[in-house]
Amino acid sequence: MATLLRSKLSNVATSVSNKSQAKVSGMFARMGFQAATDEEAVGFAHCDDLDFEHRQGLQMDILKAEGEPCGDEGAEPPVEGDIHYQRGSGAPLPPSGSKDQVGAGGEFGGHDKPKITAWEAGWNVTNAIQGMFVLGLPYAILHGGYLGLFLIIFAAVVCCYTGKILIACLYEENEDGEVVRVRDSYVAIANACCAPRFPTLGGRVVNVAQIIELVMTCILYVVVSGNLMYNSFPGLPVSQKSWSIIATAVLLPCAFLKNLKAVSKFSLLCTLAHFVINILVIAYCLSRARDWAWEKVKFYIDVKKFPISIGIIVFSYTSQIFLPSLEGNMQQPSEFHCMMNWTHIAACVLKGLFALVAYLTWADETKEVITDNLPGSIRAVVNIFLVAKALLSYPLPFFAAVEVLEKSLFQEGSRAFFPACYGGDGRLKSWGLTLRCALVVFTLLMAIYVPHFALLMGLTGSLTGAGLCFLLPSLFHLRLLWRKLLWHQVFFDVAIFVIGGICSVSGFVHSLEGLIEAYRTNAED
């Protein structure tokens, strides 16, 4: 009897000791230190699960004691293990395999929202990376030669890879070893990387980068509109700055936008028109194939201007900022990788051919916007279509920038820096409308004082494009999935981060130097 009692006391002491060690290990793990052994990590996981179940049971007992309903009437009580709890989410998540896991618009319960196919998702990505900014790629070949062509391929490969690893950061394994979607946006990934010490720092950095990129995109649309109209009608006594003012006057109603229903109707027409314009440019270039200057395509680079070309190429591939939302709205998220592969392969081939053929046609006379090289009769028609596309494309980044600003500064309750832009009836307040108009005017002023399409595009690509497409995805991937990565994945992430950082700094510095030089000499595009 004494032996049996001693044995039970020993077992109890051992169990208490193991749980204490597991809790201590868990405390160090939460502080950022890795557990010493796998057994301790397993012990911490079991202890944490038991602690959650115990607390959940206490809460349920209290609710029942108070007479509050717990679920549907007549329903069977939940069996242990039916509740899937995800640490850090603050709420239970639906079981694995449920459509509730992959919601849209930042909600995990978005199964009632319409989903898109892989083809539709690919069309959205194609619109993002095959936009009118490809018109600046021949200018990148002018300063980069064959290395510029290689960079078009390299940027496609890297952006495709970083898009995939960014989506991988949305998922984690739950207690059952099942991979579930626990995040819904780029901002959520950034916040998870900076938690627990700075839980909102990462999201703010991403928001700032996103706002800069969106506003710079709006500025580029105004710049290219003024540039195209000025070169289409050189005989008119209207300067490029005046054309930019006229374009902005047309865009001023964007300040009154509440949604993009009206604008979205023109998106398909704009995209088709852009493809037609690209075909017309390539057809004209092919008609002059006998005069192509192959000897002008060089292997050496212009050290000062080539970094600007890197920014132009990177900016033409930016799509990472909306990929989490896009993947969350797909009917089959498992097809995301295949969709990314084909869209970036197609973009790489089309961009490479367009840039090379256009440069071979005009060689050293290649301008920042390639349509400015077309003959007068063709140029006017093509440029008018391009201006229409630019003006119809402007509301999309403008509305997105306004939404980010409103959510960051005006709609976070007690944490908001300024009062809400909307009244209780949902109407936009007068000062909120004033701020929107001020944003439109700001894009105009930037377009007037910095009317250099390629330099602005290179600056934006080097600053926010490289950050959102190269630096942050690789850094987040290493931070969130470090323990699961293979050695070659770690190598790729580190290499992309280092190369992206060098290209970003170099391109940013040289773009600024180019803008300063152009401003001093009062050069016009």
Swiss-Prot record:
In this chain, the stretch annotated as Disordered covers: 69-111
Alphabetically ordered keywords of this record: Cell projection, Cytoplasmic vesicle, Membrane, Neurotransmitter transport, Nitration, Synapse, Transmembrane, Transmembrane helix, Transport
Molecular function per GO: gamma-aminobutyric acid transmembrane transporter activity; gamma-aminobutyric acid:proton antiporter activity; glycine transmembrane transporter activity; glycine:proton antiporter activity; L-amino acid transmembrane transporter activity
What name has this protein been given in UniProt?
Vesicular inhibitory amino acid transporter
Q: Which organism is it from?
A: Macaca fascicularis (Crab-eating macaque)
Family indicated by similarity: Belongs to the amino acid/polyamine transporter 2 family.
What is catalysed by this protein? Answer: 4-aminobutanoate(out) + n H(+)(in) = 4-aminobutanoate(in) + n H(+)(out); glycine(out) + n H(+)(in) = glycine(in) + n H(+)(out); beta-alanine(out) + n H(+)(in) = beta-alanine(in) + n H(+)(out)
Which parts of the sequence lie on the Cytoplasmic side of the lipid bilayer?
Answer: 1-132, 226-265, 327-341, 405-438, 483-489
